[in-house]
Amino acid sequence: MATYYSNDFRSGLKIMLDGEPYAVESSEFVKPGKGQAFARVKLRRLLTGTRVEKTFKSTDSAEGADVVDMNLTYLYNDGEFWHFMNNETFEQLSADAKAIGDNAKWLLDQAECIVTLWNGQPISVTPPNFVELEIVDTDPGLKGDTAGTGGKPATLSTGAVVKVPLFVQIGEVIKVDTRSGEYVSRVK
């Protein structure tokens, strides 16, 4: 794998630190008036998704991580594992609850997901940026009820709970941003 010096760190770069893969989220190279230059780097730990901030000297280096992002189709959940298929080779991969995390509530059958593999094993699953889900439960919107400026909670077909505007009713399909978990619009 390639070696990267701290001044080469860019957003999206995947590196190895302490034997684990990390993704660089942002990097700021600082040259103080006195002393050695350094890089202030925000990293995301790929195994757990936690964010860390580290400082690297300009002479520090890190190995590139042997991490692969693949576009796979979500097939089904058997209760313990979530199964995905490569559309080109028809090879199937299984991801456990640790790799899926909170993204399980956004997975729909036949959805294209980005699965990150490390040493051939899935370590994270990223659902599509937007999904269209049906509302299965929400409070009825009363005519003239505009006292609150917010919205109301709605339970979606996958079990996710999203705050929606007062005019949205049970049975309607809505578009949700999976990155923030927020309502975007109604689907006609």
Curated annotation (Swiss-Prot):
Per UniProt, the keywords (alphabetical) are: Cytoplasm, Elongation factor, Hydroxylation, Protein biosynthesis
- InterPro entries (alphabetical): Elong-fact-P_C, NA-bd_OB-fold, Rib_uL2_dom2, Transl_elong_fac_P/YeiP, Transl_elong_KOW-like, Transl_elong_P/YeiP_cen, Transl_elong_P/YeiP_CS, Transl_elongation_fac_P
User: How is loss of this gene reflected in the phenotype of the organism?
Assistant: Cells lacking EF-P display highly pleiotropic phenotypes similar to those lacking EmpA or EmpB. They exhibit reduced growth rates, and they display increased susceptibility to hypoosmotic conditions, antibiotics, and detergents and enhanced resistance to the compound S-nitrosoglutathione. The susceptibility phenotypes are largely explained by the enhanced membrane permeability of the efp mutant. Analysis of the membrane proteomes of wild-type and efp mutant strains reveals few changes, including the prominent overexpression of a single porin, KdgM (STM1131), in the efp mutant outer membrane.
| Subcellular location(s) per record | Cytoplasm
- Any idea which residues bear N6-(3,6-diaminohexanoyl)-5-hydroxylysine here? K34
As for PTM, the annotation reads: Is beta-lysylated on the epsilon-amino group of Lys-34 by the combined action of EpmA and EpmB, and then hydroxylated on the C5 position of the same residue by EpmC. Lysylation is critical for the stimulatory effect of EF-P on peptide-bond formation. The lysylation moiety would extend toward the peptidyltransferase center and stabilize the terminal 3-CCA end of the tRNA. The hydroxylation of the C5 position on Lys-34 would allow additional potential stabilizing hydrogen-bond interactions with the P-tRNA.
A GO cellular component annotation here is: cytoplasm
GO terms (BP aspect): peptide biosynthetic process
The organism's place on the tree of life at top rank: Bacteria
**UniProt pathway annotation:** Protein biosynthesis; polypeptide chain elongation
**Listed Pfam families:** EFP (PF01132), EFP_N (PF08207), Elong-fact-P_C (PF09285)
One GO molecular function term of this record is:
translation elongation factor activity
**Where does the protein principally reside?**
cytoplasm
Asked if the record carries the keyword Protein biosynthesis, the reply is yes
Briefly, what is this protein's role? Involved in peptide bond synthesis. Alleviates ribosome stalling that occurs when 3 or more consecutive Pro residues or the sequence PPG is present in a protein, possibly by augmenting the peptidyl transferase activity of the ribosome. Modification of Lys-34 is required for alleviation.
Q: Which protein family is it in?
A: Belongs to the elongation factor P family.
Q: Which PANTHER family does this entry report, sorted A to Z? A: ELONGATION FACTOR P, ELONGATION FACTOR P (EF-P) FAMILY PROTEIN
Name-wise, this protein is: Elongation factor P
